């Protein structure tokens, strides 16, 4: 019988690599996301970057485009980073792919409130998957995909906020 003090299954010894899921809409991926992914690799053997389909958002880039843009960010880390997508529950996707943790980046206290509630719900749904919060690096704390899209749409300078190939893709999207 589970008591509040029983160790969750994620604490038990697991064979194989320590895998974490890093979910998001990534519309588009930013240097802030990349910072979280690279720092996550210091904690986990593999990161599954998971593009989440969110019916409440209308993405600028298609699912395939977002996955391709992410893949292009990590040519040197093919063995440690993989990209997938889901329209289901993230915590179920994590369990199905052997992930022991979900990584979430926090920019501000307002992010924490939402993310904390989400982490508690995920724990209720699947105790074997933990949530790990990583603070966004100071360089990227103000960056959001929405802000970058708005700046790009108005021909603002977004260089240094996203990888060069993402900047080109945004310029191309808004040139149409």
What are these regions (language model features)?
Residues 1-176:
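Nucleotidyltransferase catalytic core that binds NTPs
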């Amino acid at each position: 019988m589970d008591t509040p003090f029983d160790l969750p299954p994620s604490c038990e010894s697991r064979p194989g690599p320590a895998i974490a899921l890093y979910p998001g809409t990534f519309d588009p991926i930013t240097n802030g996301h990349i910072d979280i992914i690279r720092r996550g690799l210091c904690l986990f053997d593999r990161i599954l970057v998971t593009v989440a389909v969110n019916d409440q958002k209308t993405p600028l880039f298609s699912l395939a485009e977002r996955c391709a843009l992410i893949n292009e960010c990590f040519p040197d880390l093919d063995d440690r980073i993989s990209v997938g997508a889901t329209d289901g529950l993230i915590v179920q996707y994590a369990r199905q792919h052997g992930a022991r943790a979900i990584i979430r980046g926090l920019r501000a206290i307002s992010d924490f409130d939402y993310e904390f509630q989400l982490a508690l719900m995920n724990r209720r749904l699947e105790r074997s998957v933990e949530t790990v919060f990583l603070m966004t690096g100071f360089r990227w704390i103000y960056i959001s995909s929405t802000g970058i899209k708005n700046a790009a749409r108005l021909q603002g300078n977004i260089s240094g906020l996203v990888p060069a190939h993402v900047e080109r893709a945004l310029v191309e999207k808004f040139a149409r």
